[in-house]
């Protein structure tokens, strides 16, 4: 009789542990999903900031000629920095 009760207690504890593990796994997926969303949002913000910066290449022109070149290439032109100003020359 005692052995049967111990077996039932262990089976009950095992079932509770299994249910608990499954619910925690669900929460884990939820947390990982939230982390993934935050990473995607951060990537999108960085990409938008980079695009905004390259679209305003005249601000970066004295430091990096490449910004002017990329800005004008998007307009299908050739870019050149002259005295803090990005000049786009159509081909």
UniProtKB/Swiss-Prot annotation:
Tissue: Expressed by the venom gland.
Pfam families listed in its UniProt record: Scorpion_toxin_alpha-beta
Chief place where the protein resides: secreted
InterPro entries in the cross-refs: Long_scorpion_toxin_alpha/beta (IPR029237)
Keywords: Cytolysis, Disulfide bond, Ion channel impairing toxin, Neurotoxin, Potassium channel impairing toxin, Secreted, Signal, Toxin, Voltage-gated potassium channel impairing toxin
Keyword Methyltransferase belongs to the record: no
Domain BetaSPN-type CS-alpha/beta: 58-91
Keyword Secreted belongs to the record: yes
Entry's Gene Ontology cellular component terms: extracellular region
Disulfide-bonded cysteines: 61-81, 68-86, 72-88
Localization: Secreted
Signal sequence segment: 1-25
GO biological process, one term: killing of cells of another organism
A GO molecular function held by the record: potassium channel regulator activity
Top-rank taxon: Eukaryota
Family of this protein: Belongs to the long chain scorpion toxin family. Class 2 subfamily.
Additional remarks: The fragments 26-37, 34-42 and 43-52 described in PubMed:18718845 correspond to the propeptide and some additional residues of the chain. The authors do not know if these fragments are the result of the post-translational maturation process, or if they have a biological activity of their own.
Protein name (record): Tityustoxin-19
């Amino acid at each position: 009789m005692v052995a049967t009760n111990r077996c039932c207690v262990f089976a009950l504890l095992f079932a509770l542990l299994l249910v608990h593990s499954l619910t925690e796994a669900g929460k884990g997926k939820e947390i990982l999903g939230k982390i993934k969303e935050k990473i995607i949002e951060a990537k999108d913000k960085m990409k938008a900031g980079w695009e905004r910066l390259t679209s305003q290449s005249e601000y970066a022109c004295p430091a990096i000629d490449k910004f002017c070149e990329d800005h004008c290439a998007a307009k299908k032109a050739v870019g050149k920095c002259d005295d803090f100003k990005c000049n786009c020359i159509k081909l």
